[in-house]
Amino acid sequence: ELLIPSIFPTISEDYERVYSDFAITSLCNEMEETIQLLSLQSQKDESLSFDKQQSSNVIDLKKMNKVWSTRFDQLPNNPGILLETLRIRSLVTDVTEMKPQWLRFIEVATNSKCVELSQQTLDYLSEKGMKDDPDLHILKAKLLWSQGNDFKSKAIKYLKQNVDESNPNYYFILGKWFQEEGEYKKAREKVSKAT
């Protein structure tokens, strides 16, 4: 609450200057909500019968997850902010329930050249039961591609070995990569197979 008076008068004047304070305040708010949800979950675990209170707790958790998803969509493409937000939320929400948010984070981290962070996150999600997820394999291939010429053939090979051709993104990704390499005929062939 101490940050609020310093933030709001200056937001209209200089958003960039107060953004870090605003981000800290938002993370504190998320931590408070997480603590409340942990409290609700412990109440649910202590209750042996499925009564109205427990039903209300489940509804509250679903509502909060929906609110969090909407908020996450509005966050800037900053790997640090996205990661801190995901770390807080993962205290109460299963990784598989936050799959779109984790995938966005990996994409942003890869585009920001945070190779090690992207790889660690891919490994973490694999350990959490998403090892065979085709979206994870696509991001792994994109991560390889982003590492430069020495890794591009590995990226194509990895994509072909781990992602089924029936996946709607398979040919689009290959087409995009061939286009980046100036191989327009191959790019056109791949994209035409996707449509």
Positions of the model-derived regions?
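Extended alpha-helical assembly domains of large eukaryotic scaffold proteins
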Residues: E1-T195
